[in-house]
C-alpha cells in the first residue's frame, strides 16, 4: 500500500499552506517508489487522484467553502481518477442557484490558494445548474465532462445533476453522432492510422481517447460509472474488457514515463523518448541483435496494442449504433438481402445467417471477405458478426490453411479487381490475415526505427498491394502511364501480388529477409496452385525486389554497360515487366516523399533502356561508335536550322566520347546552342530548365565555365544556400579547359521555374561564386531537424576503382543533414580531387551518395592514397554526426 503523511498534519507542522507543494513532491516520490517496487499503474494513478482529492478538500475547507451549499467536482481524466504525474487538475464548482457575493469571495480564496500551492495545474470552471444546461446544450466538450463529473466534496444533493443535465440536453443519437464526428476529426489530425512514427498515445487512433470514447457513449446511455459494469449489461464481453484494460494499463504506463521524462504533460511518443521508454519496459538490445532491436520490439507492441484498441472501438460503437440508435429511428425498416445460406446483407452491411456459421462452416471466414472484395456496395460488417469473426479467426490453424477450399477462396480474394486493399486491411485488422499467413502475423506492427520507412512493415505491404491494384484503374493511368500499361499486359497479375505480399515478410527475423521471404513464398505458392516455374518467378522477384531501385539510385544509367549488366540479370522481358511494376509500387508504398518525377524518370529510363537491350539481344556488345554517331546526328538535326554545322562541330570536337555516350541528343543540342550563343563571353554561363524527362519536379541547371579546382564544391554550396537539393551531377571537362556541368536539382519551395526573380537570383549567385574561384562560399548554418539527433547511423566510406573509367568511385553512407553535400564537396576540394559525376540519394535520415573522382592529373588514387583519403572522409563524417547529436 502507498503510505503518505496526512496532509493536515503536514501543513500544521510547517505552519504554511504552501507546504502542500512540498507534500505533493514527497507524495510523488513515494508513488514513483511504489511503482518501481511493482505496484500496478492502475493503483498508482488512482492513488494520485485520491491524494489530489485530499489536497483540494483541505483547500476547500481552508476557504470556508464547506460552509456553503456549493459542490466541488473533478472532471476530465481527474474525474475518472486517471491522474498522471503532470496531468491537469480539472475541476468544476457547481451551484444550484446564483452564487452569492460571500461565496464568490470564498471561491476566489480557494482558486488563489490552488495557484499558490505551485505544483497544481488547475483547469477551473464555476457554473450554476442553469448555466450548465445552457452550455451543455451547445458545447459537446462541456456535455462530455459532465458525464464523468465526480463529486469530491460539498453539497451531495448536486451529485446527480451533471448526468441529468446531459440527459436533458442530448439524446442518444445526437450525442453519438456528435462524438463520432469528433472522433473522425481527431483521426484525421493523426493521419487516420495507428502507426505514426511518433504517435500521440492519447489522441491518435488506438490511443487512450478511443477507450474514453467507448466509456462516454456507453455511460451516457446505460448510466453506469465504469466500463466494467457494461459486462453485466451484455454490451461488452469479459474477454473484450480484459483486452481493453490491459491495453489501457500499457498506454497509461507509457504516458507515465513520458510525463516523467519530459517533466510536463506529454502525450507524444517522440523519437526523443522511444529508446529510453523501451528500456524501461525491458526492451533492450542484446549482444548480436540489430542496433535498434529493442526500440523496434517496443514500438511493435505499441502498434499492436493500438490496433486492438481501435478495432474494439470500431466494433463496440458500431454495435451501439446498430442495437440502440438505428432501431429507434422514426419509420425505420430493416433492409435485408439474402446472399446465400451463410450470409445476408442487413442495412448495407454483411451479417451471418446465424451465430454458429463460422463454427459449423469454417470456410465462411474467408467466404465473407470474398463477398466483401467483390461487392463494392457493401459498407462493412455488422457488429455482431464482427464479434463472432474476431473469435473465429483465432481458430485458424495449419489444418485450416491446408484445406484446398480455403486456399482457393484466399486466391479468389487476391485476384479480385474491386476492393483488394480494403479487404486485406479488414482481414489484417480482424486477425484473419495474420492467422492464415502466420509469417505475416509476425510483421504486424513491426516498425523500422528510421525516417525512411514511415509505415509499419504490414501497413507498407498492403499499401504496395493497393498501388499494384491501382495500376489497372483508369484514374491512375495519368499518374503512372508507363507502368500502368506494363502491368495491364502481365500474363498473371497474381504473381506480382504474391511477390508483393511476401517481399518483406521475413523482416525482423535476422538474416537476409529477401531470401527467407522467397522460401516462404515458394511454400505458399505450391500450396496455392502455382506451377514450379511461377513459384520460381515469385521467388526471384522477392530476392531481387531492390535490384531496379538500387541500380537507378546508385549507378549511372546513362552508361550503356550499366544498363546491359542490369538487363543480363533479368534475362527476358517477363522478368523486367514484373520487376518494374513491383519496384514502382514498392517505392510509392515506402514513403510519399520518396517518389517524385525525377525518380519516376530514372525508373522509366532504366526500364526503356533495358527493354531495348533485351529486344536487341543480350549477347551483343555495345557498339559505342554507332551510339556516338547516332547521338550526334540526332543532336545536329535539332541545331541545323539555327547554326552552321561547322560551328557545331567546332564545339563538339573539344568534347570526349563519354559526353556523347551519356548525354541525350536533346541535352547536347541544349548545351551546344547555349555555348554558341555565349560566344567569347568570359563570364560563366548558367541556364535553368525543367527536366524534360522528369516533368515538373526536377530542374536541370547547366553551367559552362572555365575549369577550376573547387568547381563542384562551390556549386553545391551555392545550391544549398538557394534551397536546392542536388539529385544528380555530371561534370565534363573539354580539351579547352572549359567545364560543362549539368546538375539535376529538386526545389524545396517548388517555385524556381515559376518565379523569374528567384530564377535570376540563383543564376546570379552561381555566376558570382564561379567568377571568384579563390573565394569558396562558406557552409550555411541551418537548423538541425529534431528527429535527426536520435538516430545512430554508422558512417561508412567505400572507395573502389572503376577500371573502365579509370576513376575512383566513392560511396558514402551517413546521417543526412543540411549542407552535407556542400561539406563533402569542400573536403574533396581540400584533398585536391576532381569530381566527374555524382549520384545523390536521401533515404529518410540516411544519405547514400556516390561520387566519381580523380586526382588533378586525371589519374585515380593509388591504394595508399585511397586509405588516407577514406580515413579523412570518415573522420569528417563522424565529426559532423557528433555535432548533430550534441546540437
UniProtKB/Swiss-Prot annotation:
CDD domains: ACT_ACR-UUR-like_2, ACT_UUR-like_1, HDc, NT_GlnE_GlnD_like. Gene3D superfamilies: Hypothetical protein af1432, Nucleotidyltransferases domain 2. HAMAP family: PII_uridylyl_transf. This is Bifunctional uridylyltransferase/uridylyl-removing enzyme. The gene is glnD. Keywords: Hydrolase, Magnesium, Multifunctional enzyme, Nucleotidyltransferase, Repeat, Transferase. Its EC number is 2.7.7.59, 3.1.4.-. Residues 1-337 are annotated as: Uridylyltransferase. Coiled coil: none annotated.
Amino acid at each position: 500500500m502507498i503510505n503518505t503523511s496526512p496532509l493536515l498534519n503536514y501543513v500544521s507542522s510547517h505552519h504554511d499552506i504552501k507546504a502542500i507543494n512540498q507534500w505533493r513532491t514527497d507524495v510523488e516520490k513515494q508513488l514513483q517508489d511504489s511503482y518501481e517496487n511493482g505496484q500496478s499503474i492502475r493503483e498508482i494513478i488512482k492513488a494520485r487522484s485520491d491524494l489530489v482529492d485530499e489536497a483540494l478538500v483541505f483547500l476547500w475547507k481552508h476557504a470556508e467553502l464547506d460552509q456553503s451549499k456549493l459542490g466541488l467536482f473533478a472532471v476530465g481524466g481527474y474525474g475518472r481518477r486517471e491522474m498522471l504525474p503532470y496531468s491537469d487538475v480539472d475541476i468544476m464548482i457547481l451551484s444550484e442557484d446564483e452564487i452569492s457575493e460571500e461565496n464568490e469571495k470564498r471561491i476566489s480564496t480557494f482558486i488563489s490558494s490552488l495557484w499558490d500551492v505551485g505544483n497544481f495545474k488547475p483547469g477551473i470552471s464555476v457554473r450554476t445548474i442553469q448555466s450548465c444546461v445552457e452550455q451543455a446544450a451547445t458545447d459537446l466538450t462541456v456535455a462530455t465532462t459532465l458525464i464523468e463529473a465526480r463529486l469530491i466534496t460539498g453539497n451531495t444533493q448536486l451529485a446527480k445533476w451533471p448526468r441529468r443535465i446531459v440527459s436533458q440536453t442530448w439524446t442518444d443519437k445526437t450525442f453519438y453522432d456528435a462524438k463520432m464526428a469528433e472522433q473522425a476529426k481527431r483521426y484525421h489530425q493523426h493521419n487516420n492510422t495507428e502507426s505514426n512514427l511518433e504517435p500521440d498515445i492519447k489522441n491518435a487512433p488506438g490511443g487512450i481517447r478511443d477507450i474514453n470514447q467507448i466509456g462516454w457513449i456507453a455511460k451516457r446511455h446505460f448510466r453506469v460509472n465504469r466500463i466494467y459494469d457494461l459486462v453485466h449489461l451484455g454490451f461488452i464481453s469479459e474477454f473484450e474488457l480484459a483486452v481493453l484494460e490491459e491495453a489501457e494499463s500499457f498506454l497509461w504506463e507509457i504516458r507515465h514515463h513520458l510525463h516523467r521524462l519530459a517533466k510536463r504533460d506529454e502525450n507524444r511518443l517522440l523519437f526523443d523518448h522511444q529508446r529510453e521508454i523501451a528500456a524501461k519496459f525491458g526492451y533492450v538490445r542484446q549482444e548480436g541483435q540489430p542496433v535498434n532491436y529493442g526500440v523496434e520490439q517496443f514500438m511493435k507492441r505499441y502498434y499492436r496494442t493500438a490496433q486492438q484498441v481501435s478495432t474494439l472501438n470500431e466494433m463496440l460503437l458500431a454495435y451501439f449504433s446498430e442495437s440502440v440508435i438505428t432501431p429507434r429511428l422514426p419509420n425505420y425498416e430493416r433492409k435485408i438481402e439474402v446472399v446465400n445460406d451463410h450470409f445476408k446483407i442487413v442495412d448495407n452491411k454483411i451479417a451471418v445467417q446465424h451465430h454458429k456459421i463460422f463454427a459449423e462452416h469454417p470456410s465462411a471466414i474467408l467466404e465473407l471477405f470474398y463477398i466483401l472484395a467483390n461487392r463494392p456496395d457493401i459498407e462493412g460488417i455488422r457488429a455482431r458478426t464482427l464479434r463472432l469473426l474476431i473469435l473465429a479467426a483465432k481458430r485458424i490453424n495449419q489444418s485450416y490453411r491446408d484445406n484446398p477450399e480455403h486456399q482457393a477462396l484466399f486466391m479468389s480474394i487476391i485476384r479480385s479487381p474491386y476492393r483488394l486493399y480494403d479487404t486485406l486491411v479488414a482481414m489484417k485488422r480482424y486477425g484473419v490475415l495474420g492467422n492464415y499467413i502466420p509469417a505475416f502475423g509476425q510483421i504486424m506492427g513491426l516498425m523500422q526505427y528510421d525516417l525512411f520507412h514511415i509505415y509499419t512493415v504490414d501497413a507498407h505491404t498492403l499499401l504496395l498491394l493497393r498501388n499494384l491494384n491501382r495500376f489497372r484503374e483508369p484514374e491512375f493511368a495519368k499518374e503512372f502511364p508507363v507502368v500502368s500499361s506494363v502491368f495491364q499486359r502481365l500474363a498473371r497479375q497474381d504473381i506480382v501480388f504474391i511477390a508483393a505480399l511476401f517481399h518483406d515478410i521475413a523482416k525482423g527475423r535476422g538474416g537476409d529477409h529477401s531470401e527467407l521471404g522467397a522460401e516462404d513464398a515458394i511454400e505458399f505458392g505450391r500450396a496455392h496452385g502455382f506451377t514450379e516455374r511461377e513459384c520460381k518467378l515469385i521467388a526471384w522477384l522477392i530476392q531481387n525486389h531492390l535490384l531496379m531501385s538500387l541500380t537507378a539510385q546508385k549507378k549511372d544509367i546513362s552508361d550503356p554497360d550499366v544498363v546491359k549488366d542490369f538487363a543480363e540479370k533479368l534475362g527476358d522481358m517477363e522478368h523486367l515487366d514484373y520487376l518494374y511494376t513491383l519496384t514502382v509500387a514498392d517505392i510509392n508504398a515506402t514513403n510519399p516523399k520518396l517518389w517524385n518525377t525525377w525518380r519516376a524518370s530514372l525508373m522509366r529510363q532504366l526500364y526503356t533502356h533495358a527493354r531495348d537491350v533485351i529486344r536487341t539481344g543480350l549477347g551483343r556488345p555495345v557498339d559505342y561508335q554507332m551510339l556516338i554517331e547516332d547521338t550526334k546526328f540526332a543532336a545536329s538535326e535539332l541545331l541545323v536550322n539555327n547554326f552552321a554545322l561547322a560551328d557545331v562541330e567546332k564545339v563538339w570536337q573539344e568534347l570526349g566520347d563519354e559526353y556523347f555516350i551519356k548525354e541525350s541528343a536533346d541535352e547536347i543540342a541544349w548545351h551546344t546552342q547555349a555555348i554558341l550563343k555565349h560566344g567569347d563571353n568570359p563570364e560563366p554561363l548558367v541556364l535553368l530548365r525543367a527536366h524534360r524527362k522528369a516533368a515538373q519536379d526536377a530542374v536541370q541547371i547547366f553551367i559552362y565555365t572555365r575549369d577550376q579546382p573547387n568547381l563542384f564544391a562551390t556549386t553545391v554550396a551555392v545550391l544549398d544556400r538557394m534551397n536546392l537539393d542536388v539529385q544528380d551531377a555530371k561534370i565534363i571537362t573539354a580539351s579547352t579547359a572549359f567545364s560543362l556541368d549539368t546538375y539535376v536539382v529538386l526545389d524545396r519551395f517548388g517555385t524556381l521555374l515559376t518565379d523569374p526573380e528567384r530564377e535570376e537570383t540563383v543564376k546570379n549567385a552561381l555566376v558570382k561564386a564561379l567568377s571568384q574561384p579563390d573565394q569558396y562560399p562558406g557552409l550555411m548554418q541551418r537548423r538541425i531537424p529534431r528527429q535527426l539527433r536520435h538516430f545512430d547511423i554508422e558512417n561508412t566510406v567505400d572507395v573502389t576503382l572503376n577500371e573502365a573509367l579509370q576513376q575512383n568511385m566513392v560511396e558514402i553512407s551517413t546521417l543526412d543533414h543540411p549542407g552535407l553535400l556542400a561539406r563533402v564537396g569542400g573536403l574533396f576540394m581540400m584533398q585536391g580531387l576532381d569530381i566527374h559525376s555524382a549520384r545523390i540519394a536521401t533515404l529518410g535520415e540516411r544519405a547514400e551518395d556516390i561520387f566519381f573522382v580523380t586526382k588533378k592529373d586525371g589519374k585515380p588514387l593509388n591504394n595508399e592514397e585511397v586509405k588516407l583519403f577514406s580515413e579523412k572522409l570518415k573522420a569528417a563524417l563522424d565529426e559532423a554526426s557528433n555535432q548533430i547529436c550534441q546540437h
